[in-house]
Amino acid sequence: MSHSNNHSLRWAWYALAAVIVVLDQLSKYWVQMSFFEFERINLLPILDFTLVYNKGAAWSFLSEAGGWQRWLFTAISSAVSIVLVVWIHRLVAVQKLLLIALTLILAGAIGNLIDRVLLGKVVDFVLFYYDGHYFPAFNVADSAITVGAIFMLADVFWGPSEADLKADVNEQVKNKPEGDSNVR
């Protein structure tokens, strides 16, 4: 793959992350405009849409901590997002499962980061339950993070071999434009 193709593909991953962030934010906006807090609409026997706010992290961790957690989770999400952008930039093209994983996790982190910065809490609205047992409400960003984690695990088992990675890097070095020190 040529250097310019690899560069274009890298931006495609960032564009995909941006699309997921937009979908996440639009869905949260729709829920906030359509529901009162805690209002529920049944979609399926095991699925409702509802509007709940989470001031904490996953499963409402630290949600009652008094407000400081907003800044802690904002800092963590910001740092993770920066690391993921750099990581995606450094990956080689054959690492598709890992690229998908990191793109989804990046989108989810940014989606929830936007909520924390603008609202001080995260908007959740998808509620699964069965026989009186409820899974914590979640959103599109949370789903992206979860699916990204699954892809990351898949990469561990089915990702490219060391030989494939070396071949891809060698191909990029061979096709690198003169004077370009960036090989990815």
Which residue stretches match the model-derived regions?
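Alpha-helical transmembrane bundles and membrane-interface segments of multipass inner-membrane proteins
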Residues: 1-184
